[in-house]
Amino acid sequence: MHPHHFTRRRLLGTAAMTGLAGAGLATGVALPAAAADSVIVDGVKITKVKDLTGPDITGRFGLHWVDLGCVTRCPDGRNLFVFGDSFGPNWGENWRSPTGLWSSTERLADGVEFDGTPGGDWAKQLIPYEHGDEISTIIPSDVITLGDKIYLHAVVNQGFGNVIWSGIWVSADNGETWQDSGARFPGEAYEKRWQLASWDLGKDNWVYVYTSEFLRESSMILHRVRPWHITRPEKYQPWGKRHGRWCWGADPTPLSDDIIGENSLRRFGDKWIHTWFDGPRYRIDCQVLKHPTQDPRTAKKFTMLHGTSWDNEDVNHLAQLYGSYVIPGSKLSDLHIAVSQWNTSDNSRYNVMQYRFQGLDRYDWRA
């Protein structure tokens, strides 16, 4: 995924696009980066645990430069992180997307460590295709484990940002190999709001799916689908208003006016958390909801991380941030997310980080 609409000009042969959030820098007093490893905001302790990727960390897998990192718990108990456009050893070399890494880390507070990759010693592209005119790149939006299979939802670009369709790929071996399910979500459907997805399984045995436009230019809509129909788009039931009342089966109605970028919808017991990158406001927000159908306007937002400039970073203010993927093993009281950062001026930072949030269970979510 590309923060602020930047394209990879050298790779795609297109002109660089302007940033979304240059004028949206977060306000407030910034602490020096070295002043503290954590900060408390409204009773929530925010900590940067570590860099998860980078040449000296994941270069041994051929993943020197990666972003995103949506993640699921595999059937065998490991976590599988799925990354977007990936390069190595040098920037722009050996372009692959999506790629993956496994982690057996159980104590997230100690920091996630990776111990393997689909492909053996060198990370392979999970979906077989050539980066070219027909398909420039395929970007992952989320993964989910249902029974003994993993389902990967990904966005197919014909020129970055020109989404021709999104699809679902399936793995029956913990992410080592993947098969195209044949599911196709048209890029223009629902005013492009069926492109980028996040999902989780409810206690009622429905998978709830938030979707929005890939280029962070739309609000989100909601569908639900039975797990056994997850690869059949025609079985997805939209949530919308009919005669002024919300119901399943109506044309999908946007849930709020917020612009939803990369996001993560996850259930914790009887509650749901939704984390997302808000491009226009240049920050990562979250909400705790009673159910995915809850009107987001009835719940308060918590800003997890603010955007800022490169010379004003501190614990919870990051330059050119994006992503926001909940890491399995988290709890509402101790939430960990994967966050991306890309310095588009020189590519010196293009990596994924782990952030920890303690106390979201005690936060007052009432609007």
State where each predicted segment sits:
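N-terminal secretory signal peptides
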Residues: M1-R10, A15-A34
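Generic low-polarity alpha-helical segments
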Residues: R8-L12, T105, L222, L265, ...
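Short, surface-exposed linear segments at secondary-structure transitions and domain or protein termini
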Residues: L11, Y190-K192
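Generic detector of bulky aromatic hydrophobic side chains
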Residues: L25, V29, L63, F81, ...
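Beta-rich carbohydrate-recognition and catalytic domains
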Residues: A36-H64, R73-E134, T145-Y190, K203-I260, ...
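Beta-propeller and closely related beta-sheet repeat lectin domains
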Residues: D67-C70, I135-D142, W194-W199, G261-S264, ...
